[in-house]
């Protein structure tokens, strides 16, 4: 059988519609999807993330948590994002549930200083607390990185990361991370694991969600009932 000279027919054949066999059409579509996925991956670059120096000081306090992620001791692999992705949170306004921090200032959360030493973190009161970053406009988000307190090996309770287009987080809320396994915060039992703080921070895949506001919850830690934030970075594109 000769090849049709009609470009519309050739296009249909390439897309799989010219094949009567359903299996053949399925295979062709999978091949095209694979090619498109490969092209998309080729456009991605490592996340432009600068890590602070390790800062563990003193004697670690032993603790046990039922849902604790076991440290691997292996450096986190590069996280790929579209080219042009930047930290949209740098210098952006921050609000918090505790408006009178015990230590530090709320703007420390997005000031770009991730050292974790005295004068670079904010300490909020006990119980469930949150900080919220206003990116200024809706953006496509790819990763959120949070450093609570990396001068000591500790884990924070009920860590929940949500994004929304609504300032009050009443509508259109998306939960990207939740390790509140007991539903203490009331957002549903989380399936993510608690983790030990390190200078790498915790990288959360934002999966390309569109949002303007980012809110992070915590409920004390394995050392005290207080809540801390060294830095929050939100990587995306406007």
Predicted regions and their residues:
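Sec-dependent signal peptide recognition
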Residues: 12, 25-32
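Residue-identity detector for glycine
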Residues: 2, 16-18
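Hydrophobic h-region of N-terminal signal peptides that target proteins for export
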Residues: 33-41
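Predominantly extracellular/luminal regions of secreted and cell-surface proteins
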Residues: 80-113
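N-terminal pre-domain segments of enzymes
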Residues: 41-85
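Trp- and acidic/polar-enriched beta-sheet ligand-binding modules for extracellular glycan
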Residues: 42-58, 97-99, 122-130, 138-139, ...
């Amino acid at each position: 059988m000769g090849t049709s000279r009609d470009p519309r027919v050739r296009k249909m054949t390439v897309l799989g519609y010219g094949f009567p066999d359903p299996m053949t059409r399925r295979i062709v579509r999978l091949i095209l999807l694979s090619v498109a996925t490969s092209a998309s991956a080729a456009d991605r670059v490592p996340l432009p993330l600068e890590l602070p120096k390790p800062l563990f000081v003193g004697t670690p306090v032993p603790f046990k948590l039922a849902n604790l992620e076991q440290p691997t001791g292996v450096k986190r692999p590069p996280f790929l994002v579209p080219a042009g992705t930047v930290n949209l949170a740098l210098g952006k306004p921050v609000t918090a549930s505790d408006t009178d921090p015990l230590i530090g200032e709320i703007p420390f959360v997005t000031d770009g200083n991730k050292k974790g030493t005295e004068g670079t973190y904010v300490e909020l009161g006990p119980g469930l607390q949150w900080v919220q970053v206003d990116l200024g406009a809706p953006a496509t988000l790819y990763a959120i990185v949070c450093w609570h307190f990396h001068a000591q090996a500790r884990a924070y309770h009920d860590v929940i990361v949500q994004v929304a287009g609504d300032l009050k987080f009443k509508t259109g809320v998306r939960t990207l991370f939740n390790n509140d396994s007991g539903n203490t915060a009331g957002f549903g039992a989380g399936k993510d694991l608690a983790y030990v703080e390190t200078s790498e921070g915790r990288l959360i895949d934002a999966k390309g969600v569109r949002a303007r506001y980012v809110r992070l919850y915590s409920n004390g830690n394995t050392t005290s009932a207080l809540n801390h934030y060294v830095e929050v970075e939100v990587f995306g594109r406007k």
